[in-house]
UniProtKB/Swiss-Prot annotation:
NCBIfam families documented for this protein: PRK00405.1, rpoB
Gene that specifies this protein: rpoB
Membrane-spanning parts: none
Name of the molecule in the record: DNA-directed RNA polymerase subunit beta
Catalytic activity: RNA(n) + a ribonucleoside 5'-triphosphate = RNA(n+1) + diphosphate
Matches recorded under CDD domains: RNA_pol_B_RPB2
One Gene Ontology molecular-function label: DNA-directed RNA polymerase activity
Keywords noted in UniProt: DNA-directed RNA polymerase, Nucleotidyltransferase, Transcription, Transferase
Subunit structure: The RNAP catalytic core consists of 2 alpha, 1 beta, 1 beta' and 1 omega subunit. When a sigma factor is associated with the core the holoenzyme is formed, which can initiate transcription.
Amino acid sequence: MGYSYSEKKRIRKDFGKRPQVLNVPYLLTIQLDSFDKFIQKDPEGQQGLEAAFRSVFPIVSNNGYTELQYVDYRLEEPEFDVRECQIRGSTYAAGLRVKLRLVSYDKESSSRAVKDIKENEVYMGEIPLMTDNGTFVINGTERVIVSQLHRSPGVFFDSDKGKTHSSGKVLYNARIIPYRGSWLDFEFDPKDNLFARIDRRRKLPATIILRALGYTTEEILNLFFDKITFEIAGDKLLMTLVPERLRGETASFDIEANGKVYVERGRRITARHIKALEKDNISQVVVPSEYILGKVASKDYVDLESGEIICPANGEISLETLAKLAQAGYTTIETLFTNDLDYGPYISETLRVDPTYDKISALYEIYRMMRPGEPPTPESSEALFNNLFFSAERYDLSTVGRMKFNRSLAFPEGEGAGILSNEDIIAVMRKLIDIRNGRGEVDDIDHLGNRRIRSVGEMAENQFRIGLVRVERAVKERLSLGDLDAITPQDLINPKPISAAVKEFFGSSQLSQFMDQNNPLSEVTHKRRISALGPGGLTRERAGFEVRDVHNTHYGRLCPIETPEGPNIGLINSLSAFARTNDYGFLETPYRKVVDGQVTEEIEYLSVIDEANYIIAQANSNLDENNRFTDAFVTARGERGESGLYKPEDIHYMDVSTQQVVSVAAALIPFLEHDDANRALMGANMQRQAVPTLRADKPLVGTGMEKPIALDSGVAVVAKRGGTVQYVDASRIVIKVNEDETIAGEAGIDIYNLIKYTRSNQNTCINQIPCVNLGDPINRGEVLADGPSTDLGELALGQNIRVAFMPWNGYNFEDSMLVSERVVQQDRFTTIHIQELSCVARDTKLGAEEITADIPNVGESALSKLDESGIVYVGAEVKGGDILVGKVTPKGETQLTPEEKLLRAIFGEKASDVKDSSLRVPNGTSGTVIDVQVFTRDGVEKDKRALEIEEMQLREAKKDLTEELEILEAGLFARVRNLLISSGADAAQLDKVDRTKWLEQTIADEEKQNQLEQLAEQYEELRKEFEHKLEVKRKKIIKGDDLAPGVLKVVKVYLAVKRQIQPGDKMAGRHGNKGVISKINPVEDMPYDENGQPVEIVLNPLGVPSRMNIGQILETHLGLAAKGIGDQINAMLKQKQEVEKLRSYIQKAYDLLGNGSQKVDLSTFTDEEVLRLAGNLRKGLPVATPVFDGADEAEIKELLKLGGLPTSGQITLYDGRTGEKFERPVTVGYMYMLKLNHLVDDKMHARSTGSYSLVTQQPLGGKAQFGGQRFGEMEVWALEAYGAAYTLQEMLTVKSDDVNGRTKMYKNIVSGNQHMEPGTPESFNVIMKEIRSLGLNIELDEE
């Protein structure tokens, strides 16, 4: 495989045995594709906004003479770009303009003649736009809309598993779930009657629904039952025989025909008997007349003369009715065929409990159930019933629902409408009865074929439709008011309801979440999260164990490992690495096709529904060089996802990758296959909490997943086109694009501006650092600059640390860690946190608040860091309590004493009618001010600081644009120069003249002259565009800000805090091995090896066996080997050995065992490239051990050997304090450690004086409230056990809720009297009040 220039800088040795057939797909597809469908980037097909408009329009007036038609829509360009929206705190959105047509028809004309057409464009609010990274900027913060896993529309058959009724009888039910509209349920009760419910309301006999559809009793019976025909022949009764129906019954009479007895009375009829009857073609048998008694008539039998009903349909036949039927001249009687085994009489029984008798009474019954208390009329009942299931406006199964419905009921695919038909309802009842009869089985609700993904686009479309429907009602009213001559579409539409619905969804829906921006991985995982919670989903409390559990259909679709611990476990899942959604919203996963035992390169995506019929081999099945299975039997998944052994020729598909099963976060854990799943879950979750360190350090032991995550997360800058680096500094990179990638007529220069020191949602620091040099050749898609937690385009969440597993004086008890001081000195885990503090000046009733440096009663020193506008300088170092922005608020006039009045009169002091409400640094925080932004309302005069900031922004904008122009001009003039020189001009002459004069030259060659003219035009264009961009920027900067009502000014101050690692900080490895730092130990006290190299962290060996995460030990060994090879390379470089020796050693390392899929050939590298590679391998050879396909023991030992290290992975250590040898070798190696965002600085606080709870008068709790520490029940026991009575009394009274006692104590302390008088705690009063509220009087007698 060929490596590009930047890939040659550092190559990861890959232990994967299996070639990668399919690269990891773009990780944010699920978000971006869904939103593109919503705003319909691809104009084909009706979806998203288009579908919403089409479903609501045209809106027709009630009289039908006017209608408002939809023509098309367009999205405007957003006013501000993403970055500006974040700074200003506004929403990144585009205005929606819709072209509507108002058509009115002539009322007088008989044919619909058009009288008038008005068409214009209407503004319909704003639609938030998705950024390139799949997020939304709402009110200045980045948010993610999490996809939802909900029950797919369609029909589901289920049972209560015997839990409802005390007898344990299993009751079956069917539920038709539409995409929108009313649910229709059918269910059996314990007496086996079939009932229906609409929208989970009161149940009705199911036959009422059938009657409402217009079926009579006879038709209903015909739909659900087979018939038995009896013939009356004189005094004999003959029954038409269908032998198959007799199976399992006991004969109540001799079954005989043609003088031969086939079954004797009292015998059970078996298959042998049935065969004999079929063989002799017996079609009728004589039955005794008692046999027909109790059978049910299938239709009405009427006396033709009198018109009287002898036996109604569904009526039982008795001797009397039999005689009457014979008398009336009936020779055949049809009855229903039922038995106890597999043809139950359920519908017949239900008809008996059904109080209705015809269509209208059934409609009335449904109306009373849906709208209790309203008197039904025939019209309203009919309309209500039709609107429930048969109106396309109110009911929609959707294409997914119809597809699931047809598959479930074995209807032809693709037939049927979005509404229900009579046949649909009957088919559902039939299937439910079949299931009750023991044919067919219920669905599994947790099967991923019955749950589908609703992504951003679809949810936004639904919200948009809700808004449109609200608008539709208003428009209908307006259209029916008349006077339409003066009205235009613009007057009819009020965009408020639409923008309100959209805003509410993006701003406050349960699925619109504040993006987790701790590090690139947490961003990617958040966007790939699938939640079963949210509107229309489950709730935590109601979700049982089954829903949360791993299901076999999750294979390759949802990760079985990554899910939160706690109440949401199993409800929030993560998409597997290769999974995607199909058009219906079901999850699919890729497989390689297998033909006759040969695995092809062809890849197919299968959904769970399609997968059911195939046998699928695992990705680690052994193949020979022709891609044939080598084993006689292959482990594969067959029917129902159960695994078993199959012959190679029976296999249809094979997994594409071993990482297919897990999500990206779990795929980052090396040796995942050796970790217990519970710990792997913690590992996957904790990687998302890692704070980006000051200097990112790639993991020595990775999995190969680091690169795709870093690239797809969008934190690194990736080249859009290939070229050469022309300019690079800390804030911008300029690439001269390759000739073959430029578009004709453009300058061929790409400029990338980098993000510097900005704040993320979690207060971590986002900063991009260039990783290319001048003149480097660049390919498209390569990394130009590293973002937070990326190192040469690879995800780097933590640091490679030398660890030893051994006890050390109890400092690693219970998962604590002992850390060497060297780690702190080298700033290995130092992180930068940026806090945003804002100060808002409002207009109050008493007057406007003012931002000023003139603050009453504040000393000079407190104002030393403020400028004359009262705002802190950039670069000032501040600590808790310092003023950042001086602000005064007017306070109401107070009554002054005569003395004060006199003083006022003499000194004219007016300052005391304002109070200080300045923004101060919160307690316990300190840092450096790195940025200040001032936002001023339109029409309010800007202060000096705001003008300075404005001027600076204008200067920077102009400088940026000028530099951009210069770069582009240079590119353009270089082309002009080449053109002129190729036409014979003298280079030296050209360089003497002003460049702009070059464009005025004339060339004899016409084609070249045209090119020159084109370039001259481009130059003009560039100039114009520069002026235009500058003007736009200027307007944006000068323009007043759009602030909330009543707000005059907002000042935002950004503080950067540098945090070193310290005791109490939480750290973790990638295997769920987390712990807290107990002590920072001097380097000289740490255990060291024979070369005098100390370890950096000491971990507790007891944390490994019981937790069963052995992956960490293998990682440590492999890390040691990788570092050993790095050390060898480093030694060679230091000794300045010849390049060939270096090349062969590095080649040996790459060629060592287990390089199945990756071949690195260093002979194609130049000496310079080998040296650059060696320089990057000094700190260790990075290795990749893919999940389930990683390095094994033998390979690790070989690598250790090559690094000149003991193959046991254990080293003799010496105690740093005494220099004595420890009694046995210790496992030492390199582990990748992360610092998690649970820092002791954010958690520790101590209360001095603070607020009290209103009712109990006890101090509040928690850091946010500046609360105290609860002295709880168990702590009281401790003091009681010591007999410390006075201490205990103090704790329970004056230090807690004895209000008088604590004020007295304060007075005593102030007056120097160390005395305390405890009183009655407030809790006693509270409990007395509570007892009184129960109606019990309680009084305290003072005796």
